[in-house]
Amino acid sequence: MLSGEIFRADWDSRETSWDFARPPYLRGGHSLLQDAFDDWYRRSCETAEEAQRLETENNRYWADVYGLADKVEVDVPLSRVSLTYNPRFAFAPTKGASERAEEEYRWLHFQRSARELISWAIGVTMGRYSVDVPGLVLADQASSLDDFRARVAESRLQPDDDGIIPVTGGAFDDDASRRVKAVLRVVFGVSDLGDNIEFLTRCLAVKSGSTTAEFVPPVIPADPEQALEDYMAKSFAADHQKDYSGRPVYWSLESPKGTFRALIYLHRYTPDTVGQVLTKYAAPFVDRLKAESEAVGRERDAVMGGDR
């Protein structure tokens, strides 16, 4: 593969590329997410090394042409091969910091892949993507489910009916964490769903080492389901905004104190969307919280009354 082709393929592996087809770690038909991420990390490293070889050869050729072979550095460090998915470029230590261990590069690569997988899963839920066809599906203003069905005749996973995904810790059937699990179930299968959720949330828990502390691999969260819900509630919107350079396609609507959240899709937004968020999700959620609070109050009163 030529250097230009390598860099083009690297760019198109990003969801923000117009030519993005599907996540690169979905190749190979793996049923375990860890195997898929391992394979993607290996391919990313091999691609970076090939690009390094080609760039070094190019430098050497031009140095020879201009008689500068003894005067300029022709070897290209792997950390300067500017591929998005080159771990040693993407996660290069800051100036003056010690070199990262191979295991740290690997886990940082896994963490980014986990965040990207969740973003893609939300896209599948919204109809932006499909598990059955590559590339963008619904990406025009006021796109509808009819538009989706025209593009994807037989879909293993239908988009959300209203393009609104509540982020409430499982209070609704179409809650964000449940939707992510539904995509994992379809893509990787039912039998390994538990293992895949454990590994996914383990990747999300990666904490990079510092100049004063060695890297410690993440452990499986005590409650992987809760860890996924926490990520969706606390981190997903910020990660998405960063990945899309401040121009997100999934908008987060939140109550003043952040108790209620919902995601809506830019290209499925209609004049009725905000009203639907309020009537179908926010109001029932508030009623549920109120009922739970009243139930706790009654239990407390019963306990206190029994102690008299």
Q: Locations of the language-model features?
A:
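Extended amphipathic alpha-helical segments enriched in small hydrophobics
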Residues: M1-W62, K290-E294, E299-D301, D307
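Terminal accessory regions of large proteins
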Residues: S17, E50, N59-A63, G67, ...
